[in-house]
């Protein structure tokens, strides 16, 4: 179970971090 939770967290971070980076970059570009 713990390994599944860690894998889920790793996948979530792998998706969330680039998405957040693109959103910030997009917001800065529109300023």
Curated annotation (Swiss-Prot):
GO terms for biological process: photosynthesis, light reaction. Pfam families: PsbM. One of its GO terms (cellular component) is photosystem II. Keywords: Chloroplast, Membrane, Photosynthesis, Photosystem II, Plastid, Reaction center, Thylakoid, Transmembrane, Transmembrane helix. Its main location: plastid. It is a single-pass membrane protein. PSII is composed of 1 copy each of membrane proteins PsbA, PsbB, PsbC, PsbD, PsbE, PsbF, PsbH, PsbI, PsbJ, PsbK, PsbL, PsbM, PsbT, PsbX, PsbY, PsbZ, Psb30/Ycf12, at least 3 peripheral proteins of the oxygen-evolving complex and a large number of cofactors. It forms dimeric complexes. NCBIfam families: PS_II_psbM (TIGR03038). One of the components of the core complex of photosystem II (PSII). PSII is a light-driven water:plastoquinone oxidoreductase that uses light energy to abstract electrons from H(2)O, generating O(2) and a proton gradient subsequently used for ATP formation. It consists of a core antenna complex that captures photons, and an electron transfer chain that converts photonic excitation into a charge separation. This subunit is found at the monomer-monomer interface. This is Photosystem II reaction center protein M. It comes from Mesostigma viride. The gene is psbM.
